[in-house]
């Protein structure tokens, strides 16, 4: 993983190009991320930044974390995340510095990770896209039942990982190779092409893309 930012998903809109084409974008607000710790090869075996995002009352921070924030001379945050760094990335930055949206540029491709919307307990039709059974012709009880979930005496059990009913959503999801359409430094906004995981107001983590798009190869 390379350097990234923690932001808040605001919602979706669209923008128009000079030729009149409509591009759907997700608006992400990135409050400046405060560096709380710089990890180095000499002390930790790898290079990384630990950053804090948002604000939290000092009364709601436990003593170990309060000491950690105090050592870096930064305000306590809602979230604390770590980003691995390459050998040449941000070599001059130090604890207490702020990372803003200007570390990204328009046209850059990024990966975005967020917590998907929780949809509660769902059956196999909604959860795993199973087909329904017959609506008529003698079927009166099992229209949306999954059917057989195992075999006979051999192996005599249900395989681990079998697709069944259960919790849907509320898991972390990463979308890759999303293009940054616009960087608004004044308002701390990123406009990223397409949809991003999570509900409006949810936390998202934006990092440089780990893959190259076909047109970039």
UniProtKB/Swiss-Prot annotation:
Pfam families: Ribosomal_L3 (PF00297)
Keywords: Methylation, Ribonucleoprotein, Ribosomal protein, RNA-binding, rRNA-binding
PTM (free text): Methylated by PrmB.
Residue ranges of the region described as Disordered: 134-154
Record GO terms (molecular function): rRNA binding; structural constituent of ribosome
GO biological process, one term: translation
Residues found modified as N5-methylglutamine: 153
Gene Ontology annotations for the cellular component aspect, listed alphabetically: cytosolic large ribosomal subunit
Main function: One of the primary rRNA binding proteins, it binds directly near the 3'-end of the 23S rRNA, where it nucleates assembly of the 50S subunit.
Family the entry assigns: Belongs to the universal ribosomal protein uL3 family.
Subunit and interaction comment: Part of the 50S ribosomal subunit. Forms a cluster with proteins L14 and L19.
Protein name: Large ribosomal subunit protein uL3
């Amino acid at each position: 993983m390379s350097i990234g930012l923690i932001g808040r998903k605001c919602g979706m809109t669209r923008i128009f190009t000079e030729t009149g084409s409509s591009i759907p974008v997700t608006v992400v607000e990135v409050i400046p991320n405060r560096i709380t710790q710089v990890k180095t090869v000499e002390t930790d075996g790898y290079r990384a930044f630990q950053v804090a995002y948002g604000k939290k009352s000092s009364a709601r921070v436990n003593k170990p974390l309060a000491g950690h924030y105090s050592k870096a001379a930064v305000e306590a945050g809602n979230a604390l995340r770590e980003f691995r760094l390459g050998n040449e990335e941000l070599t001059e930055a130090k604890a207490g510095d702020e990372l803003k949206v200007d570390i990204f540029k328009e046209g850059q491709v990024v990966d975005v990770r967020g917590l998907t919307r929780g949809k509660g307990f769902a059956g196999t039709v909604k959860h795993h896209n199973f087909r329904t059974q017959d609506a008529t012709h003698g079927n009166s009880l099992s229209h949306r039942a999954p059917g057989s979930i195992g075999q006979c005496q051999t192996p005599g059990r249900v395989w681990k990982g079998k697709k069944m009913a259960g919790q849907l959503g509320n898991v972390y999801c990463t979308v890759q190779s999303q293009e940054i359409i616009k960087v608004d430094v004044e308002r701390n906004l990123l406009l990223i092409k397409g949809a991003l995981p999570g509900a409006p107001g949810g936390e998202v983590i934006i990092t440089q893309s780990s893959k190259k798009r076909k047109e970039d190869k």
